[in-house]
């Protein structure tokens, strides 16, 4: 027969029993008396964890956020995106939208968000096109390139002092494009065979749209790699070069910065390797089942920005 809590306390003090034994015995006593609810204890533990997560994210100084699959799908703003930007501004957080897409300029991205009802200045955007231009201008100032891509890439390279050259360029640079021809593939492959270095703005093989997944730079550059017999160098996420520049732009230390993304193979691994806290949202290309296939894990997982904001 179990003794009462008071009797047990006196007995333990008298005999010098350990604290662990006291706690264990007390739990067994409470269970017998139907006064101990394991479900309540479990729920309290979850609530404590949620408050801990809220504290971690709420007090970060800087936020790096992907766009496709996090902020929008095509021309559809995702739940919580506008509220998230409002929260960043009202709490004076440093933030940067870091996208592997090279199609649009920062101005075009700002205008797109404005059309969707979210006001963000151009200075808050850093694209793989800008990262590629920065990389090439540091590697070989005044270099030239044969470029396959859209306005975002062309403008970034031009503004970095890189000239266009389709005869004997230093680099062949490939980004996302919707105007892709066999003649471009052929010329690019021949130029690489003659000595031009092959650069890709990002390694993504697919990108999300309202219609579904479509080929991205990693897929588009593949025929050139195969024909020229070389592997491209990719500047965008998860390349540490792009991550270091992003953190430097924010002016914060890694431990005070968090990255939010929808791709395990770019956003999350980039954050882990840069020693940032990582948030995976399941509003883009990654499902919970897919997460299990990777050797690494994000620190936090949410269905989307709307759910994340509930903890902040």
Where would I find each of the regions flagged by the language model?
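Intrinsically disordered, low-complexity segments enriched in serine/proline and basic residues
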Residues: 2-9, 17-26
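Conserved phosphate/oxyanion-binding catalytic-loop motifs
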Residues: 101
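Compositionally biased, low-complexity peptide segments typical
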Residues: 35-41
């Amino acid at each position: 027969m179990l003794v009462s809590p008071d009797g047990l306390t006196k007995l333990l003090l008298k005999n010098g029993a350990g604290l662990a034994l006291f706690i264990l015995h007390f739990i067994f006593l409470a269970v017998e008396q139907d006064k101990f609810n394991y479900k309540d204890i479990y729920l309290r533990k979850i609530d404590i964890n949620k408050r801990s997560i809220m504290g971690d994210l709420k007090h970060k100084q800087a936020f790096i956020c992907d766009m496709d699959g996090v902020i929008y799908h095509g021309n559809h703003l995702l739940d919580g995106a506008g509220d998230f930007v409002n929260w960043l501004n009202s709490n004076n957080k440093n933030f940067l939208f870091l996208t592997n897409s090279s199609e649009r300029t920062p101005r075009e991205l700002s205008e797109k968000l404005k059309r969707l009802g979210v006001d963000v200045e151009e200075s808050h955007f850093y694209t793989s096109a800008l990262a590629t231009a920065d990389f090439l201008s540091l590697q070989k100032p005044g270099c030239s390139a044969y470029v396959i891509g859209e306005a975002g890439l062309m403008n970034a390279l031009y503004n970095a002092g890189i000239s266009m050259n389709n005869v004997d360029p230093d680099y062949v640079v490939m980004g996302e494009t919707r105007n892709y021809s066999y003649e471009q593939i052929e010329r690019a492959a021949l130029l690489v065979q003659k000595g031009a270095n092959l650069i890709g703005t990002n390694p993504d093989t697919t990108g999300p749209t309202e219609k579904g997944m479509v080929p991205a730079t990693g897929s588009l550059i593949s025929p050139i790699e195969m024909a020229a017999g070389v592997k491209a160098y990719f500047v965008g996420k998860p390349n540490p070069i792009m991550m270091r520049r992003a953190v430097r732009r924010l002016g914060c230390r890694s431990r005070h910065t968090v990255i939010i993304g929808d791709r395990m193979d770019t956003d999350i691994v980039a954050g882990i390797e840069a020693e940032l806290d990582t948030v995976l949202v399941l509003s883009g290309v990654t499902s919970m089942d897919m997460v299990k296939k990777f050797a690494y894990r994000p620190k936090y997982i949410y269905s989307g920005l709307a759910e994340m904001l509930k903890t902040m």
